[in-house]
Amino acid sequence: MKQYTVAILGATGAVGTQMLECLNEQEFPVGKLKLLASARSAGKTVEFRGEQVAIEEACPEAFEGCDIVLGAAGDDIAKELLPEAVKRGAVVVDNSHAFRMDPEVPLVVPEINADDIKWHHGLIANPNCATIIGLVPTWPLHQLAGVKRMIVSTYQAASGAGAPGMAELEAQLAALGRGEEIPEPRAFAAQLASNLIPQIGGVKEEGFTSEEMKLQNEGRKIMHLPELRVNCTCVRVPVLRSHSESITLEFERDITVEEARAALAAAPGVKLVDDMSAEDAHDRFPMPMDTSDQDLIWAGRVRRDISNPEAACGITFWCCGDQIRKGAATNAVQIAKLLCE
C-alpha cells in the first residue's frame, strides 16, 4: 500500500490532537508525519505509533514534500498558509471556515456527498461541526422523502470553542463546587457553568448569528439543495463535549415514523437509540455523555411533527454527536482516506 506524507496544521489544539488519534485509529497509511503549530510549540515532541515526532513551526516551506495536509488552525492562519501547501503539491482538507463557501472548494461529508471530492482543486473543506452532526441523520430521511425545510435548535458543548473552552468550563465547575468566585470568562461571552448562552458567533442578517446561518448555507451546498430553508437557533450549553440537536424536517412526500426509524437504523454513520420503554435511560434516547469520544451520530426521539397541518410530511428527532470527532477530526480523516482510494 502506498504511504503518504501527512501534515497536521494546528497539531497541538483539540481538533489537531484528535486528528492524530484518528489517523492511528483508522490505520491511515502514514509514511511520514509532520506536525505544524506555532513557534511556542516548536521543538516539543508527540508520540505517534511508537515514535516521537517533533513539532515544527508552521510556515510555507514546512509543506514541502507533503501529500496531504489536514488543517486544524483558525481562519486567518488557514487563509495564509494552506494555499501555500496547495502550491507545493499537497491536497488540503481544512476544518476552518475559511474556504467552506468558496464555489471552487468542495464541502464534504463522506456519508452524503463523497463524489464531490472528485472535482477538488487542491482544497477540500470540512463543514461546521453542527452542520455535520445535523446533516448525517437528516440525509437518509431526505433520500426517503425529500426534505424541503428544517427547524433546528442546537445545544453545543464547550468543546466547540476548542481546548480553551473546555478548560474554562472545567475551571468554572470546579470553582462552583468549592464555593469560590467564578473566574472571569474568556472563551465565552458569559459564565457557562450553570448557564446557557444563546449566541454562538457574530450577529448576521435579521438577528441570526453566523453559527445559525452555517447550517442553511452549508447544508444547501453539501446536499445540493439550493432552495433548502433552515431556521436555526444555536445555544452554548454547560456540557464538556458532544453537541446535541433537536431537528424538525418538512418533506416533499409523506413519510411515516416507522419508515424514518428504519432509514436511520440503516444509515451509515448513524446509531438509532429510540426505545422510550427501555428501563435504562441510555437505551431510550441519545445523550451527549454517551456520544463523547464516539464517531457515530446517535439519533432518537423520532416522532411526527404534530404542528404541521400536513402531518404525514413532518418528522422530529433528536441527535447527539462528538464535536471534536465526527464534527471535525474524524470527518477530515475520512475525507483524506477517500483521497487515497
What are these regions (language model features)?
Residues 1-192, 227-229, 262, 290-291, ...:
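N-terminal Rossmann-like NAD(P) cofactor-binding subdomain of oxidoreductases
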Residues 20, 216-220, 261, 265:
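Generic solvent-exposed, charged/amphipathic alpha-helical segments
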Residues 120-125, 195-206, 317-319:
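Helix-loop-beta segment of a Rossmann-like dinucleotide-binding subdomain
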